[in-house]
Amino acid sequence: MADFVGSWKYGHSENMEAYLKKIGVSSDMVDKILNAKPEFTFTLEGNKMTIKMVSSLKTKITTFTFGEEFEEETPDGKKVMTKVTKDSESKMTQVIKGPECITEVVREVVGDKMIATWTVGDVKAVTTLLKA
């Protein structure tokens, strides 16, 4: 998991608007999220990871233990249950159970890029972060 540790800046995304609409985000909030251009800092302490996201919308800090389900809040204020598992030192899978749907997010570090693939039903979006 050491591959994730450090600072990451937003690179680009593909099909994120369709994904956000599929999970029930309002049109107004979709526009705000798409223009937020977040930066992330990942830290690791034992089996706990902390992800700090700073964007024009807000700052969000999420700390979790791999393999344990926890409650978190989405950017549009919905409460969801989330579980993150380690797939390898450079890959993790997050399952988000929300009121309308279940989303799977697979994050993988490849060189100086972190590629996150967001899947809900038949809709898939990809976000690429660049090592800062």
Curated annotation (Swiss-Prot):
GO terms for molecular function: lipid binding. InterPro entries: Calycin, Fatty_acid-bd, ILBP, Lipocln_cytosolic_FA-bd_dom. SUPFAM superfamilies: Lipocalins. Keywords: Acetylation, Lipid-binding, Transport. The modification N-acetylalanine is found at residue 2. Gene3D superfamilies: 2.40.128.20. Belongs to the calycin superfamily. Fatty-acid binding protein (FABP) family. This is Fatty acid-binding protein Fh15. The lineage of its organism: Eukaryota, Metazoa, Spiralia, Lophotrochozoa, Platyhelminthes.
